[in-house]
């Protein structure tokens, strides 16, 4: 799993936006991204673990919810070939930014 998390980190870096593992404190209004492991998502059959998985969340705080930032992240996630979905888009009044939140399932 560590090598797959490293691939995700490299993919997010390739978007051209700053991403940090588990987040950081930024000045209000500054665009940034974070990613972190959220939970296990194991595949189970006949009462046994068939494959171990991890759900990773990717968060991007941006001024533009539908343009280049979103497209850049989604292109990189698609290129990884793992299941993912855009889970929510919200306006964060305390930062003045739009918060995009993806869930990525990583197996193996």
Question: Where do the language-model regions lie?
Answer:
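Acidic-leaning, charged glycine-interspersed low-complexity segments
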Residues: 71-108
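Small/polar-rich, solvent-exposed N-terminal microdomains that initiate assembly or binding
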Residues: 1-44, 65
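Oligomerization/assembly interface segments of phage tail-like spikes and tubes
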Residues: 52-64, 97-107
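Sterically constrained small-residue positions within well-ordered secondary structures
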Residues: 26, 49, 91-95
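Short, flexible, solvent-exposed loop/turn segments with mixed acidic/basic and small polar residues
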Residues: 45-51
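Generic signal for short, ordered secondary-structure residues
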Residues: 37, 52-56, 83
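Short secondary-structure transition/capping segments
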Residues: 25-30, 58-74
